[in-house]
A protein has these predicted regions:
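Active-site acidic/histidine clusters and adjacent loop/turn architecture
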Residues: 2-41
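Soluble non-cytosolic domains of exported or imported proteins
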Residues: 9, 13-21, 43-46, 109-116, ...
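Extended, low-complexity, intrinsically disordered C-terminal regulatory tails
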Residues: 27-78
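Short aromatic/hydrophobic-glycine micro-motifs
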Residues: 35, 57, 126-130, 176, ...
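Short low-complexity, flexible loop/linker segments enriched in glycine and/or proline
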Residues: 52-56, 143-149, 196
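Catalytic cores and adjacent binding grooves of peptidoglycan-active enzymes
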Residues: 66, 73-154, 159, 166-169, ...
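Short acidic, glycine/serine/threonine-rich helix-capping segments at coil-helix boundaries
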Residues: 132-136, 156-220
């Protein structure tokens, strides 16, 4: 099926299952704060990424960056650049672009109070906020880097520091992380805390955080 490179996908169900849980939890909190969120883009096909990267770049530049020549010839053109990478986390189904809207109007202002609140809430559930990047900040962009496209569990081998910090904070709040430091490093202490927490709930004891466990943790 042909890809409509000029159209963005907004369907949350196109995201990794773990990312879906995180986003849905965040959206509920955002709405609770009387903010109307607008999902701008979720999953992005690779060809659409080629199309976006081609904006403001020459064929030679695109090919030099790693774009197949056929796509570079098709999508390279003048104008303003709209993205800085060929390997967006959107392609991996682990990123979302999200902004507030008021009176039916999208707010593309990184200094807007509702934008700042959205960033705060998205970070509270484990997203990395593009707004905080020192190079080429991207305030609508939120991602979960370092996990596999089809990964169904956060584990010692499938996580990142943003997610791990949230898991540690929630385990500490639930009384299972003791005096350990919330450092974003998934080690033996995090494994043991997850196992003790799961045992207290009568669940199968392991050190994995799947969608059900993640949803439960984020409710604390």
């Amino acid at each position: 099926m042909a890809v409509n490179v000029k159209s963005s996908t907004r369907d949350i169900k196109e995201l990794n299952p773990l990312v879906q849980v995180m986003l849905n939890t965040a959206l509920a909190k955002i709405k609770k704060n009387k903010i109307s969120p607008l999902v701008v883009e979720t999953y992005r096909p690779k060809e659409r990424q080629y199309y976006l990267y081609g904006q403001g770049r020459s064929v030679a530049t695109c090919v030099g960056a790693g774009m197949p020549k056929s796509y570079a010839q098709k999508y390279a053109r003048g104008g303003n650049k709209v993205t800085w990478t060929l390997n967006s986390i959107h392609i991996q189904r682990c990123a979302v672009d999200l902004i507030p809207q008021r009176n039916g109007k999208a707010i593309w202002n990184s200094n807007d109070k509702d934008t700042k609140k959205i960033i705060e809430i998205m970070e509270s559930v484990g997203f990395e906020a593009g707004a905080n990047w020192s190079s080429s900040p991207d305030s609508p962009h939120f991602q979960v880097k370092g996990i596999s496209v089809k990964g169904k569990c956060f584990t010692k081998k499938n996580n990142n520091k943003f997610v791990t910090k949230v898991i540690q904070k929630k385990l500490k709040k639930a009384g299972f992380y003791g005096d350990y430091t919330v450092d974003g490093c998934w080690g033996k202490a995090t494994d043991n805390a997850i196992k003790k927490w799961k045992k207290s709930l009568g669940w199968r004891v392991n050190a994995k955080i799947g969608t059900t466990a993640l949803k439960k943790l984020l409710s604390y």
